[in-house]
Amino acid sequence: MAEQDSKWSELTLLPEWEEEFCCVYRVKKYGKWVMLKSLKPEYAGKLEFQSMLEKEFDVRYNLAHPNIVMINDYEYIDGLGQCIITDNVYGSSLRELINKKEISPELLLRLQTQLPDALAYIQENHIVHRPLRPEMIMITEEGKNIKLIDVGFDQRNTLKAQDCLDDIYNYGDILKQVLEVFPSKQPLLKHIADKCTDPNPKHRFHDVQELRLAIERRSSNAIYLSIIAFIVAMSILLAWLNSRRSPEHKNQPNQPTIEQAK
């Protein structure tokens, strides 16, 4: 990179995000961290792959969602060729957190809300994207929000039903991996994950909206169960307090009436 000393510095390859045709880097541009995506050297000189990368830029540049990493530019860089430039994400990938068994209740909640929201947005924009996997999901250091770092390489007027079913299957597979390392059992979420990954596509959720409704019902049920548990606990506590108080009243001597006092 001829401009490395002035414009670009501290270029670092990110092998965990390597794709079939592309490499991903973290680099400083004028002192600010960004991420680059470029074709591998063996594909960089081929027009068909250049067109593929440019089309991905065109598709992703128009995406604007809080849980999808924003694209900033499409630029030629010496030694790398044309590159897609995106915001840098400070944080850990979901894969890293799964491997470390560091899945918090807060993150589990984000996976039930933010991730389906992002998938719904992608489908609404008719984006055919790469299979969803934990490596593509970043958890930000600040806010602990979810960010999809790599979506979109084709755009159609309509999506096939299979595209939606594949998204649902991959979501369920990710949810299963998360639940395996989560400290407590989540039977209702496990049921949702099992339905997402049912071998028979006809038995899965038909679309992301149906999936989101199932998750919302699960959350509502959890709230109701918590309320019921609280009421039962309070009833037991009140019964116990009454049982403690009753013997004291029984053992107290009878107070004389006014007539007896006379």
Kindly give the residue locations of the regions a language model identified.
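AlphaC helix of the protein kinase catalytic domain
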Residues: 93-103
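A short, aromatic-enriched beta-strand patch in the conserved N-lobe beta-sheet
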Residues: 73-75
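Conserved short submotifs of the Hanks-type protein kinase catalytic core
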Residues: 78-93
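C-lobe/activation-segment region of protein kinase-like
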Residues: 147-195
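Protein kinase catalytic-loop region centered on the HRD/HxD motif
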Residues: 117-127
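Activation segment signature within eukaryotic-like protein kinase domains
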Residues: 111-112
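ATP-binding glycine-rich phosphate-binding loop
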Residues: 2-29
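AlphaC helix of the eukaryotic protein kinase fold
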Residues: 43-62
